[in-house]
């Protein structure tokens, strides 16, 4: 079972912006209830999309620079990056189907 990649301010560029595959980034925090609600979904997606897309998690408390750079104001926020740019976003504890629809769309474009 594949684990989401833990992102930091230091590895964000290499793991996300330079990635050849689309990347789903979950901006979250340990104290955030809705973030804990979608954590199992993000975990599942990491395995389901292995080899097709990267799935990562960024703790906004420990990677404040990156969170600020992307204007993260509400968490959880899920950003989908393609070719180093934000291709789509979801804000809040959204259903898995909504995430997979957006992720699948990024794979087909």
Give residue spans per PLM region.
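Conserved Rossmann-like nucleotide-binding pocket used by diverse enzymes
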Residues: 3, 8, 28, 54-56
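A short beta-strand-turn-helix
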Residues: 4-23, 64
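Short pre-active-site segment immediately N-terminal to redox-active cysteine/selenocysteine motifs
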Residues: 20-21, 27-31, 74
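Conserved helix-turn-beta segment immediately C-terminal to the redox Cys motif
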Residues: 21-22, 39-58
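Conserved redox-active cysteine motifs that mediate thiol-disulfide chemistry
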Residues: 27-41
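Structural microenvironment flanking redox-active thiols in thiol-disulfide oxidoreductases
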Residues: 60-67
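Non-catalytic, surface beta->alpha helical segment in thiol-disulfide oxidoreductase systems
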Residues: 82-109
